[in-house]
Amino acid sequence: MKKQLRGFLGTNGFCRIWIPGYGNLAQLLYEKLRGKRKRLGWDETCKVVFNALKESITTAPALSLPNLEKTFRLYFSERIGTTLGMLGQMMGQVLQPMAYLSKQLDKMARRWPTCLRAVAATALMVKEAFKLTLGVHRISLNVYT
């Protein structure tokens, strides 16, 4: 069962930039894979999360292709060690999403005060955004913590 769950999370993880809040959704299932236990301890909560991830793959929102001539906007927040973000660009009067981002802070950073976790989250999200923007340096940061 662990092998199948790892495969499912790997496939889903490949599509994570199209799934808003992926990190929060998948966190419980990743925690079930930790340790040397043979059994997963599958319960109703795991089933709900699993089904939500399956549903998210089939109903992902439409994302736009980036225009490297325009400024990018990065919105994100950090809660309980998970950073969730959205990279987008203004298309007329509408902010159009390009990617949804999610990252876990490392164990050390999770213990920091809120203000320092926000700094660590900023560094993580900017690093992820640069991968998707091909290193274009015109990114407008909007930080929400």
Give the ranges of each region predicted by the language model.
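A short, polar/acidic, helix/strand-boundary loop motif
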Residues: M91-A120, L124, Y144-T145
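C-terminal reverse transcriptase regions that engage the nucleic-acid substrate
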Residues: M1-K70, T145
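Flexible loop/turn segments at secondary-structure boundaries
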Residues: C15, G81-L84, Q93-V94, K107-M108
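Metal-dependent nuclease catalytic cores in nucleic-acid-processing enzymes
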Residues: N12-C15, C115-V136
